[in-house]
Amino acid sequence: MLDSPTLDLLDSLRRTMAEKSFLVVTGAGISTASGIPDYRDKDGVRRGAQPMMYQEFVGNPAARQRYWARAMLGWPRISASQANAAHRALAALQAENLIKGLITQNVDALHTQAGSQDVIELHGSLHRVLCLDCQQRSDRTAIQEQMLAHNLYLADVHATQAPDGDTLLDPAYEAGFKVPECPHCQGKRLKPDVVFFGENVASHTAARATLSVEQAEGLLVVGTSLMAWSAFRLCKAMAEQGKPVIAINHGKTRADELLRMKIEAPCEQVLPWLAEQLITR
């Protein structure tokens, strides 16, 4: 249940969104209700082990072996995840032309599953795999089937789920792992089609996001601490243009000083309420 102070803030947000065309940017917090772990605590501090860096992944075969061994065990959770009420609420708002567009930092494709159109996937998608040699893309399901067939020794191994389809796997299981091959060129330098730490967002994706900010009259940030520059810069640009930036997020965000309003309540409760109010009025 949403308490009275939260409902007062939400009513103010409803009035603002009824008057202005808002762009929405989402982060890991919108998918936690779908069973996908997020990255940071309420103070914006990253949980768990440090992520693999792009240069390490590209330049070190052992790093790729480690990544894919862990990712093979993490994929079933990602592939089975279902969009939750927050994803569906944003899809409903978009269908009624009540939001200007949708940008996500998430790589789980749950916005698309919920029915959202033309989602800008700022950091890519785990549902695709890119070959670093021939640049062809493959469906993640096909790569998963290949890895399972070649690494039967991991079939019954349990590993704790981590963000972005990663797992906490005992290193003893990694050494014998056979990395997947590209179905197009048989190369062994496959990478999930996502932006790693230390890697730049594709220029065409960044340009689409920038244009979306320019065309919108306000920005609604959902479920993200905005610690990644790729998303924070959008808030900064919006605020510099004198447009309102509003957040629905538990805890600290990098953009707190830029926010007109912050609602600290579960997005899977807040967004359905907001959608119902905006659509029925």
UniProtKB/Swiss-Prot annotation:
HAMAP family: Sirtuin_ClassII. NAD(+) binds at residues 27-47, 105-108, 223-225, 249-251, 267. The active site is at H123. Belongs to the sirtuin family. Class II subfamily. It comes from the Bacteria. Its cofactor is Zn(2+). It comes from Pseudomonas syringae pv. tomato (strain ATCC BAA-871 / DC3000). Zn(2+) binds at C131, C134, C182, C185. Pfam families: SIR2. InterPro entries: DHS-like_NAD/FAD-binding_dom (IPR029035), NAD-dep_sirtuin_deacylases (IPR050134), Sirtuin (IPR003000), Sirtuin_cat_small_dom_sf (IPR026591), Sirtuin_class_II (IPR026587), Ssirtuin_cat_dom (IPR026590). This is NAD-dependent protein deacetylase 3. The keyword Transferase applies. It catalyses: N(6)-acetyl-L-lysyl-[protein] + NAD(+) + H2O = 2''-O-acetyl-ADP-D-ribose + nicotinamide + L-lysyl-[protein]. It is found in: Cytoplasm. NAD-dependent protein deacetylase which modulates the activities of several enzymes which are inactive in their acetylated form. GO terms for molecular function: histone deacetylase activity, NAD-dependent; NAD+ binding; zinc ion binding. Residues 1-281 form the Deacetylase sirtuin-type domain. Its EC number is 2.3.1.286. It is an enzyme of class 2 (transferase). The lineage of its organism: Bacteria, Pseudomonadati, Pseudomonadota, Gammaproteobacteria, Pseudomonadales.
